[in-house]
């Protein structure tokens, strides 16, 4: 299973033009293998549609599906969707929020986000959720979430991406230990970089 992103979403990322993102996508499509399943990591519904038309099966939208066109596309294509947690008060995916109880609040927000998709017409069976480690969260909040993955909502498959996140430098854990922790906590899919 490969999650393909044509644009970085690191804290200092710059929005690519639609043309540039699609050029990068087509470069990958030209080299796709039928040995893998693919998801597209994008904020742009047009990029997501091109990917789905080329054999991708899942939209991984780190903005949390705030764009109604992305929701409409998921309904039209009946594809899988990975809904990443996003604080409803944030203006962008990396704006840090203040949490009193990060686990409880992330669960609450994910319930609101997924129920919104279902109300719009996305099938419940299409949905997986991602707590958004390192996105809009202080290091302590990401660490708290990481050690409480077993307390996340279990209504949907859980996707976790800790790879290359700064908070992991403070965990004193090897990559294999982090993988074991996630799997023991009930995580269904791990998003790792190729060098992991």
Protein language model annotation of sequence segments:
Residues 7-10, 130-132:
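Short linear capping/connector segments at secondary-structure termini
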Residues 50-51, 130:
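A generic short-segment signal for beta-strand/edge and adjacent turn/coil regions
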């Amino acid at each position: 299973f490969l999650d393909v992103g044509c644009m970085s979403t690191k804290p200092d990322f710059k929005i690519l033009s639609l043309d540039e993102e699609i050029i990068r996508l087509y470069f990958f499509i030209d080299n796709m293998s039928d040995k893998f399943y693919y998801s597209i990591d994008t904020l742009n519904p047009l990029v997501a549609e091109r990917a789905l038309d080329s054999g991708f099966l899942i939209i991984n939208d780190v903005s949390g599906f705030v764009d109604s066109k992305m929701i409409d596309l998921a309904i039209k294509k009946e594809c899988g969707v990975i809904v990443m947690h996003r604080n409803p008060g944030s203006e962008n995916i990396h704006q840090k929020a203040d949490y009193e109880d990060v686990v409880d609040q992330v669960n609450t927000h994910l319930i609101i986000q997924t129920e919104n998709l279902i109300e719009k017409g996305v099938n419940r069976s299409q949905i997986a959720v991602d707590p958004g480690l390192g996105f809009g969260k202080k290091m302590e909040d990401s660490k708290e979430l990481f050690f409480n993955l077993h307390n996340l909502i279990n209504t949907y498959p859980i996707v976790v991406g800790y790879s290359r996140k700064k908070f992991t430098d403070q965990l004193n854990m090897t990559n294999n230990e982090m993988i074991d922790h996630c799997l023991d906590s009930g995580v269904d899919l791990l998003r790792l970089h190729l060098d992991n």
